[in-house]
Amino acid sequence: MTIISFGKAQLSDSLRISVLLKTVYIQTYAIDGVTFEFANFITKRFSPEHIENIIKENPSQLIIAYQNENPIGAAQIIYNSHCPIRKTPVPELSKLYVLERFYGKGIGFELMKEAEQEVRKKGFKEFNLEVYIKNNRAIDFYKRQGYVSIGNVDFPMEHNTYENLVMNKTFN
């Protein structure tokens, strides 16, 4: 029997979460393969040690979807973020990653719902996210969840810059 559950990330899952994040990032963004710039970025940003630090800093900022206790998706909230367009403090959905084989099963929707509930519990009235301008699947998903585009920003890596769409949702 398959059991899907959602919960806050555990330190003991840091390695598995690291692999999950790297896998989804590669599947989504390695359009031209894994460049050195790309490899350097994901090696640092998604290392088990970096994941451990995120969990230690604030366990409620990393929500994990599990199938039979194995990570299949993740949502990361950055509470002390600022909207790059409006220049105001607003929490950011930094990541919403689901393994490709679990697309279409409501995992992303549930992770989004869990993240929004966490933000609302802390008294916030809105939520921002940035998404790669060419990631149409994600943009369409976010629009279906009530997010609207408020502008564009650049996402810098080592040698290249990538255009991201900034989206926002205001809670009633």
Question: Would you name each region that the model predicts?
Answer:
Residues 12, 16, 136-137:
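Short alpha-helical
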Residues 112, 119-130:
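Conserved GNAT acetyl-CoA-binding A-motif
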Residues 99-101, 105, 133-134:
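Active-site acidic-Proline motif in GNAT/NAT acetyltransferases
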Residues 97, 147-148:
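Short acidic-aromatic loop segments in the C-terminal HATPase_c
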Residues 2-5:
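Extreme N-terminal starter segment of soluble prokaryotic enzymes
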Residues 106, 123, 146:
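Short glycine-rich hinge loops at helix-strand junctions in the catalytic core
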Residues 87-91, 125-128, 132-140, 144-145, ...:
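C-terminal "cap" of GNAT-fold acetyltransferases
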Residues 8-12, 19-31, 39-101, 109-114, ...:
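Acetyl-CoA-dependent GNAT
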